Curated annotation (Swiss-Prot):
Name under which the protein is recorded: DNA integrity scanning protein DisA
Domain remark from Swiss-Prot or TrEMBL: The C-terminal domain (residues 290-360) is required for DNA binding and to inhibit the ATPase activity of RecG.
Knockout or disruption consequences: Decreases c-di-AMP levels in mid-exponential phase from about 3.8 uM to about 2.8 uM in strain BG214. No change in sensitivity to methyl methanesulfonate (MMS), decreased survival after UV irradiation in transition and stationary phase, strong decrease in competence. Cells lacking this gene show a reduced c-di-AMP level compared to wild-type and cannot properly trigger the DNA damage response. No effect on antibiotic sensitivity to the beta-lactam antibiotic cefuroxime (CEF), upon overexpression of the c-di-AMP phosphodiesterase GdpP increased sensitivity to CEF.
Cofactor(s) recorded in Swiss-Prot or TrEMBL: Mg(2+)
Length: 360
């Protein structure tokens, strides 16, 4: 398995490529036409200096791309060269002559050529097989075979069901955490538990987003379901991190990204997660820890984040914010008498709500 950082870059590249060839795009329509006609085809997206080195013969077209043009030109034996954007057909019926010493795991001539050209030029190369009836994408060392839309929809719907289950578990864990925060009983074990729940939900979301990109226009309903299920999930996870990271950080999303880049194996290692949050690996799971209060303060309606920052800066931790009088809150920069009362009442309502939720 590749190292995580390299894997993250690969996923980013694949994500953009899948959007480029997704259903609903002119390129995908043309590719599907070629596939149905059983003619096969080889398409290179981009025409840089490295591509020029491997292209021989053919004829210059330089015309606007259309699915019909691609279909007709694919009837010829040679490869088709598109512009970087895919909006123009530059050359047709060209012969590709990549370096034969470049390794290839493919057996068929078309796919072997496609893989070598992709490695040599760094461009996206698309091989359409008339025998296997599949479309394969190559770029550098990446290879991806496009899947049937029905198959992807099935996988996406299964992932949505899994997401719903994990979201339910996360909600229960968060409700328990809310009550513990008001009671000053949060332990490092609780923090790790919530971190794991957030991360699992976000990983499933990222997997579904890949399906959505590959589905193109067919993935609209799946996208709506994800939005309905986990709106602002990253923002809430980032506030949770700001609450419990040892040293204050300006951008919790950087740390959240590091968490998402971790392998599943590392994520299960408590000491690695501790280190990410700035705590020593020897930290006792049963030790108590106080939240700063970002996440709960953010739940108070119409309380801007700069004001939340000022409150946390003034009092340090959530218990001190809860204990503060309206007069003490009023002294914080940006908070007047009305807003001070609003914070007091907002925290009280949250405390009562979470107490009732826990009783249920």
């Amino acid at each position: 398995m590749e190292k995580e950082k390299k894997g993250a870059k690969h996923e980013l590249d694949l994500s953009s490529i899948l959007q480029f060839v997704a259903p609903g795009t002119p390129l995908r329509a043309g590719m599907e036409n070629v596939l149905r006609a059983n003619t096969g085809g080889l398409i290179v997206v981009g025409y840089n200096d490295k591509v020029k080195e491997v292209v021989d013969g053919g004829f210059h077209i330089n015309t606007a791309f259309s699915p019909a043009h691609l279909y007709e030109l694919a009837k010829m034996d040679g490869a088709i060269i598109l512009s970087d954007s895919g909006q123009k057909i530059l050359y047709a019926n060209t012969q590709l002559m990549p370096d034969a010493t470049i390794s290839s795991s493919e057996t068929g001539m078309r796919h072997r050529t496609a893989e070598r050209v992709a490695k040599q030029t760094g461009c996206l190369v698309i091989a359409i097989s008339e025998r296997r009836n599949v479309i394969t994408l190559y770029q550098e060392n990446m290879k991806y075979t496009l899947k049937d839309i029905g198959f992807i929809l099935t996988k996406a719907n299964q992932a949505i069901q899994t997401l719903e289950k994990y979201k339910t578990i996360l909600d229960k864990t968060i409700n328990a955490l809310n009550a513990l925060e008001f009671e000053e009983l949060v332990t490092f074990s609780d923090v790790l538990s919530v971190m794991h729940r957030y991360e699992m939900v976000l990983r499933i979301k990222n997997e579904i987003n890949m399906y959505i990109k590959e589905l193109g226009t067919e993935g609209h309903l799946i996208k709506l379901q994800v939005i309905e299920l986990i709106t602002d999930m990253e923002e809430e996870a980032a506030l949770f991190i700001k609450d419990y990271v040892k040293e204050k950080i300006k951008d919790p999303f950087v740390l959240l990204k590091e968490l998402q880049d971790m392998s599943s194996y590392d994520l299960l290692d408590d000491s690695i997660v501790y280190k990410l949050l700035g705590y020593p690996a020897s930290t006792n799971l049963d030790d108590y820890v106080l939240p700063r209060g970002y996440r709960l303060l953010n739940k108070i309606p119409r309380l801007p984040m700069p004001i939340v920052e000022n409150v946390v800066e003034a009092f340090g931790v959530l218990p001190r914010i809860i204990e503060a009088s309206a007069e003490e809150l009023d002294e914080v920069e940006g908070i007047g008498e009305v807003r001070a009362q609003k914070i007091k009442k907002g925290l009280k309502r949250l405390q009562e709500k979470h107490y009732l939720d826990r009783q249920l």
